[in-house]
Amino acid sequence: MPARQLAVAAPEKWHIDTKPGSFSARWRWFNLSALFLIPFTLFWNGILIGMATGVTEGFTHPERLLFGLAVPHVWVGLGLAYYCLCLFLNSTKVELKEGMLIVQHSPLWWRGNRKIPSGELQQLFVVEKRGSVSYELCGLTRDGKRQTLLTGLSDESSARFLEVRLEQALNITDQAVAGELRR
């Protein structure tokens, strides 16, 4: 086993459970950015609520003509509110259990839940997402297809930790993959 795999430390505030042939990592989404996003979300939605109450008062205000233009802003406001709730309540769990690699975001739904037979994975690797400072854990299946397993990891060391520990649990020998983040 390469020395690199032995040197990867678990990220702070992650709950790790390792048993022979299995692995589980869980972490909460909350970070300080949530505290800055809440006032913005309240301000955004407050303006929309103020507009809605002004527009609906007997439909006498000329702003009622702008009501249709507010619909996209309402969707953004609802999305921001839901995202704030997810930041406070959600956690992500990655586990190997009963021959399956399971990625689950809960308790509130979020895209990216996965359940993949672990025997289909030939290689795991980390990719830096273009246009942002986040990382993805990807897998190469036995039939040569690339599959994104987890997105939105905020630092390279967390992504590397998952790659290394899952490869160890799956008895996968680490190999270079075209397009992966250099070590």
List the predicted regions and their residue ranges.
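Cytosolic juxtamembrane N-terminal segments of multi-pass membrane proteins
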Residues: 2-31
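Short, low-complexity cationic-aromatic patches
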Residues: 14-16, 31-42, 69, 125-138, ...
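Generic recognition of long tandem-repeat/solenoid scaffolds
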Residues: 21-28, 103, 136-140
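Conserved beta-hairpin
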Residues: 25, 80-114
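Alpha-helical transmembrane spans
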Residues: 26-92, 181-183
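Short loop/beta submotifs within extracellular cysteine-rich repeat domains
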Residues: 32-34, 101-104, 110-111, 144-148, ...
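Phosphoinositide-dependent membrane-docking surfaces
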Residues: 101-102, 113-129
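A membrane-cytosol interface segment of integral membrane proteins
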Residues: 130-183
